[in-house]
Amino acid sequence: MTSTPDSRSVLTVIILGASGDLAKKKTYPALFGLYLRDLLPSNTIIYGYARSHIEIGDFKARISKGLKGDEEKKKQFLNLLHYHSGKYDEKASYDEFEKLILAEEKKQQGVDKFNRLFYMAIPPSIFIEVSIGIHGSLISKNGWSRVIVEKPFGRDLASSRELVSELGKLFKEKDLFRIDHYLGKEMVQNLMVLRFANAVFEPLWSKSHISSITITFKEDIGTEGRGGYFDQFGIIRDVMQNHLLQVLSLVAMEPPVSLNADDITNEKVKLLRCIQPIKMSEVVLGQYTSDPEGKIPAYLDDEGVPKDSTTPTYAAAVFHINNPRWRGMPFILKCGKALDERKTEVRIQFKRPDNFLFSDDDISRNELVMRIQPGEAVYLKLLSKKPGLENKIEQTELDLSYRHRFENLDLPDAYERLILDSIKGDHNLFVRDDELDVAWQIFTPLLDQIEKEKIKPEPYSFGSRGPKSADELSKKFGFIRSLGYNWPGNSPQGSKK
C-alpha cells in the first residue's frame, strides 16, 4: 500500500451489509483491486458489519472466493479485514462496534487523524436507520467521515425527497457519495473527453447534423432467482432512470465552465430540466417469456414473482430535449434483460447531406458508436469505395478498440474508481441531490401511469432482440438499422447492427 500525502492519518473503511452479495461481489473485490494497485493509504483498516453471525475465519474465506490476483497479496489483504455482527436498529450495537473500531485505530503508530469511509451495501429500506446509527455512534471525532450510498435512491420522487431530507439532517452534502457505478466505467468517463477534447466533433454535435441518438443497455441473462426483488422496481427504475439517464446527460449537456465536479453537474442538471414529459405513446414495455425451446424459465416462473406481474423487464422510450441544440431530435433509450447479447453503447446516427450524390437507398448512415461494455471501443462507421474496377460503396469503420490499441490493458473496475474518488473527496462521478431530484421528476409521472393503468408489457422470447415494437419505435423516429454489418469485422464478438 502507498503512503498518502497525509501519512499521519488512518483510513477505516466500514462496510455496512458486509455479509451480503453486493459486498462480496463488488465492494471487497474493488478494495482488493485498489490494494493491488497500491492505491489504499498505508494505514488502512477494513471493518465489516452485518446482522449475520459469522466467525472471522469463515468471513475471510467467503470474501476470498471473490478476489482475483496474487495469492500472497490476497493473504496480506485478508489480514486487513475485520467483522462484527450487530443490529441495524439498536444504538447499543453501534456503540459496541465503535469501541472495536477505536481499539483497532489505536494500534496504528504515529498517527493523529482518523478518517472513516462508510459504505452502505444494504437494502434501501434500512438506509435511514443505519444512517442514524452511524451518525449517533460511529462518526470520527478527529478526521473526516464520508458515506457511500448505493442505488436505488428511492422508488419515486416522494420517497427520494424523503431520503434526501432525512440523510441531509445527518450528513452534509459534501460528505455524501451517491454511487451510480456506470459513472465509474472507463467509456462513460471518456464521453466528455471525446466531446470536448476533439475539435472535429463539437461543430457536428447538434440536431443540425445528427438524426438520432440511441443509448442501449442489453443483458443476456434474466433475473435468475432475484425476481422477487426486481419485481419491486422493474427495468425503468433499475436501469433507465439512473444509468441510461446519466449517460444521456453527459452526451447531451452543454460544455461546462470547467472540469470541476459542481460545474459538470450544473450542466447536467440544466440539461435534465429541458427534458419534456415522456409520452406513453412513445414508450414500449416488454416482459420476457421462456426461450423458443422452453428450456429457460420465463420471468413469471422466477421464484418470488407474482404470476400476474406486469413489471417490465424491457423498456424503450423516446426523450425530447427542449433546448436550441437538440429541439426536435429524438433520444431513444432502450434497456432490457434476457436479450440476445450483453452490450451497452451510445449510437449517434448522422444525417445525410442535402446534396447526397449516391442514389442507393440501402447505403447506411454514418454513425459514431461508443461501446461502454463489453470490449470498450469507439468506432466511426464510414462509407468507402469497394476496391476494384466497379464504383461500388461499402461500409467500413475507423476503429479504436481499447484492447487492440492499448497494450497490457488492465482497466479498473468502476467500483475501484468510485471508492478511490470518495477517499479523495472527489464528487465528479457521483450523483448530487438536485440531479437526483430532477431525474425522478422526469420518470415519476410515467411510472405512476404505468402502475395506475396496469399497462401490460409485450412478451418477448428469452434470447431475442426484445419486443418487436421497440424496433418499430426506433424506425418511427428515424433510426436506420444497418442490417448485415458486423463490428468488429474479424472478431467473434461482433454484433450485427
From Swiss-Prot:
Cystine bridges: which residues?
none
- Intracellular or extracellular location(s): Cytoplasm, Cytosol
Name the InterPro entries for this protein: G6P_DH (IPR001282), G6P_DH_AS (IPR019796), G6P_DH_C (IPR022675), G6P_DH_NAD-bd (IPR022674), NAD(P)-bd_dom_sf (IPR036291)
EC supergroup of this enzyme = oxidoreductase
Any GO CC annotation of this UniProt entry: cytosol
Q: Tell me the route in metabolism or biology where this protein functions.
A: Carbohydrate degradation; pentose phosphate pathway; D-ribulose 5-phosphate from D-glucose 6-phosphate (oxidative stage): step 1/3
Q: Which residues bind D-glucose 6-phosphate?
A: K151, H181, Y182, L183, G184, K185, E219, D238, K337, R342, Q373
Q: What is its main location?
A: cytoplasm
Q: Where does NADP(+) 2 bind?
A: K334, K343, R347, R371, Y379, L380, K381, D399, L400, S401, R465, W487
Q: Which Gene3D superfamilies match?
A: Dihydrodipicolinate Reductase, domain 2, NAD(P)-binding Rossmann-like Domain
What EC identifiers does the entry list? 1.1.1.49
Substrates-to-products reaction catalysed: D-glucose 6-phosphate + NADP(+) = 6-phospho-D-glucono-1,5-lactone + NADPH + H(+)
Q: Which GO terms describe its molecular function?
A: glucose-6-phosphate dehydrogenase activity; NADP binding
The role this protein plays is: Cytosolic glucose-6-phosphate dehydrogenase that catalyzes the first and rate-limiting step of the oxidative branch within the pentose phosphate pathway/shunt, an alternative route to glycolysis for the dissimilation of carbohydrates and a major source of reducing power and metabolic intermediates for fatty acid and nucleic acid biosynthetic processes.
What NCBIfam families does this protein's entry cite?
Answer: zwf
The name this protein carries in UniProt is Glucose-6-phosphate 1-dehydrogenase
- State the taxonomy lineage: Eukaryota, Amoebozoa, Evosea, Eumycetozoa, Dictyostelia
| GN (gene name) | g6pd-1
